[in-house]
From Swiss-Prot:
It holds the Pfam family Ribosomal_L17. The keyword Ribosomal protein applies. InterPro entries: Ribosomal_bL17 (IPR000456), Ribosomal_bL17_CS (IPR047859), Ribosomal_bL17_sf (IPR036373). Keywords: Ribonucleoprotein, Ribosomal protein. GO terms for cellular component: cytosolic large ribosomal subunit. This is Large ribosomal subunit protein bL17. One of its GO terms (molecular function) is structural constituent of ribosome. Residues 127-157 are annotated as: Disordered. Belongs to the bacterial ribosomal protein bL17 family. GO terms for biological process: translation. Signal peptide: none annotated. Residues 140-157 have a biased composition (Acidic residues). Coiled coil: none annotated.
Length: 157
């Protein structure tokens, strides 16, 4: 017999927590960014990342597995048709959590969880950009040094 998760749960019962996560995931996929409490955002991140990984597969079985958790067909269609192709080259890390100010009413710590839709830059590309920038910075310095002796010779004459 499976034992329930230890510790605090969102909403009290395990079934309520599942519903909360399903609703938050639906809203995140629909709006691509939502504002929620830190605890909910931290629990939502792996939940959504697993759904996106399944959506990248694109098979009918994957679509049915995702539909078990997200019941709105329009949101499932958006996940498979719009979002999954954007994450084709990314191997995880589909979401980002940004800490916000505490909520005014009860001082609860708040966060914004959003989908990372920007293209990733490889380490090689950043190295190449840094090398190009350093070469560009060295060229003006060498040009100034070359001009300085010529100016000194002109002053002596």
């Amino acid at each position: 017999m499976p034992t329930p998760k230890k510790g605090a749960r969102l909403g009290g019962s395990a079934s309520h927590q599942k519903k909360i996560l399903a609703n938050l995931a639906s809203q995140l996929i629909e709006h691509e960014a939502i504002k929620t409490t830190d605890a909910k955002a931290k629990l939502l991140r792996p939940y959504v990342e697993k759904l996106i990984t399944k959506a990248k597969g694109g098979s009918v079985a994957d679509r049915r597995n995702v539909a078990k958790f997200i019941t709105n067909k329009e949101i499932v269609a958006k996940l498979f048709n719009e979002l999954a192709p954007k994450f084709e080259n990314r191997e995880g890390g589909y979401t980002r959590i940004i800490k916000l100010e505490n909520r005014k009413g009860d001082n609860a710590p708040m966060s914004q969880i959003s989908l990372v839709l920007e293209e990733t830059v490889s380490a090689e590309a950043t190295r190449a950009a840094r090398a190009a920038a350093s070469k560009k910075a060295e060229e003006p310095a060498e040009a100034v040094e070359a001009e300085a002796p010529a100016a000194d010779e002109a002053e002596e004459k």
